[in-house]
């Protein structure tokens, strides 16, 4: 099966629908699937639930989907870099489900592994725990967290071979590998596509069995904040 598509719009063809749930990799703006996010914006899809560590910035990353009010709900860990998000949330126009960062990562990993839920001490005694099942183990209280899956996972990797085996690069790996396993359909944008067999099997981070569609993208790789000083 050919997994390679000519561009981001083609790779999302037939996948986007109103009310869908997406996962979008990245940590801040590092390792985000910027081409696929732009293509999803251009579909006009509405009422999206977006699972992502961050909400992008005002005019980049998932911030593009917030500008056009295509996102209905965010399941995230940190959203403080986006003024558009703040305004919509405080006006009651956007739903938010906060997760501690480690809990968010484990919920995604669990979803990808077919694990419906797990117990954690993180959040016990805080607002995070409200409405969640509590259970004691060995004299300590834990809360139940559920696994997460998405209709479509949007992933950024460094390289892919033609079978969809992926290699990530440094910090840009972040949430991408676990999200690649947790999408009903996983679409990946990469900086380079190579021939199958080019990778040392020990260097592959995500096996191609998890990957459905691949594009070779062009990347701005914007930096959120840059601090400089005089030499």
What is the meaning of each model-derived region?
Residues 1-231:
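Conserved alpha/beta enzyme-core scaffold
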């Amino acid at each position: 099966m050919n997994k390679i598509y000519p561009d981001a719009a083609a790779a999302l063809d037939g996948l986007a629908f109103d009310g869908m749930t997406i996962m979008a990799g990245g940590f801040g703006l590092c390792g985000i699937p910027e081409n696929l996010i732009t293509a999803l914006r251009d579909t006009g899809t509405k009422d999206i639930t977006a699972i992502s560590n961050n909400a992008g910035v005002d005019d980049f990353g998932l911030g593009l989907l917030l500008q056009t009010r295509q996102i209905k709900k965010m399941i995230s860990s940190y959203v403080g870099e986006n003024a558009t998000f703040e305004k919509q949330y405080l006006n009651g126009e956007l739903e938010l489900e906060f997760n501690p960062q480690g809990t968010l990562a484990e919920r995604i990993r669990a979803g990808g592994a077919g694990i419906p839920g797990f117990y954690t001490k993180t959040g016990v005694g805080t607002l995070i725990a409200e409405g969640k099942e509590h259970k004691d183990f060995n004299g300590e209280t834990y809360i139940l967290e559920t696994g997460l899956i998405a209709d479509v996972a949007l992933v950024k990797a460094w390289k892919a071979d033609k079978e969809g085996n992926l290699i990530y690069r440094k910090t840009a790996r972040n949430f991408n590998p676990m999200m690649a396993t947790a999408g009903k359909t996983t679409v990946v944008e990469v900086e380079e596509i190579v021939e199958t067999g080019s990778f040392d099997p020990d260097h592959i981070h995500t096996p191609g069995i998890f990957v459905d569609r691949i594009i070779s993208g062009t990347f701005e790789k914007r930096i959120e904040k840059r601090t400089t000083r005089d030499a």
